[in-house]
A protein has these predicted regions:
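Bacterial N-terminal signal peptides
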Residues: 2-11
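N-terminal pre-ligand scaffold of iron-sulfur
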Residues: 13-79, 114-142
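Short Cys/His-rich "knuckle" micro-motifs
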Residues: 76-81, 98-100
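Short cysteine/histidine-rich metal-coordination sites, predominantly Zn2+-binding motifs
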Residues: 83-91, 102-114
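Short Cys/His-centered divalent metal-binding micro-motifs
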Residues: 91-97
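Extracytoplasmic electrostatic interaction patches
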Residues: 93, 103, 126-129
Length: 142
């Protein structure tokens, strides 16, 4: 099982990010201090590219979510940031940054578990893999 996990690839990491183990991805909390969303990808062994984003919301909390939702995921368009809102690039619905990772379902960005410890944002690879269903288009529309 460890060999399988070592085959995962993390890409699109900002300069301050590091993958310290095959089980977690670590980013410096400072990377998100400006409140702008940072988008990342995680490529699985079977070639599925899982997209997610992290931002520091207007209330000062580091939040993470998959770049997809329960409703629009098949369109594969994700989210963009407009001021203090995260906006669905498919349907145009707007979500306050302070609600990301708290509200789920519908067109809300699907929450991604994260922890902030000792100045680092830590995401477990297993939690990233839980979002694979939003990016697996085999047999789907794409």
């Amino acid at each position: 099982m460890t060999t399988l996990l070592l085959m995962f690839v993390v890409s699109a990491l900002p300069p301050a990010a590091s993958a310290d183990s095959p089980n977690q991805v670590i980013y410096s909390e400072k990377t998100f201090a400006d409140g702008k969303t940072r988008h990342f990808t995680y490529k699985t062994v079977d070639g599925i590219v899982i997209r997610y984003f992290i931002l520091k919301s207007s209330d000062g909390v580091i939040r993470a979510a998959f770049d997809a939702c329960d409703v629009c995921w098949l369109e594969n368009k994700g989210y963009s940031q407009k001021g203090d809102f995260v906006v669905c690039n498919n349907c145009g619905k707007r979500f306050p940054s302070a609600r990301i990772n708290e509200v789920h379902g519908g067109c809300n960005p699907a929450p991604l578990k994260r922890n902030v410890e000792n100045g680092n944002v830590i995401i477990q690879v297993a939690d990233i893999l839980d979002g694979k269903r939003y990016f697996n288009f085999q047999g789907g529309k794409r």
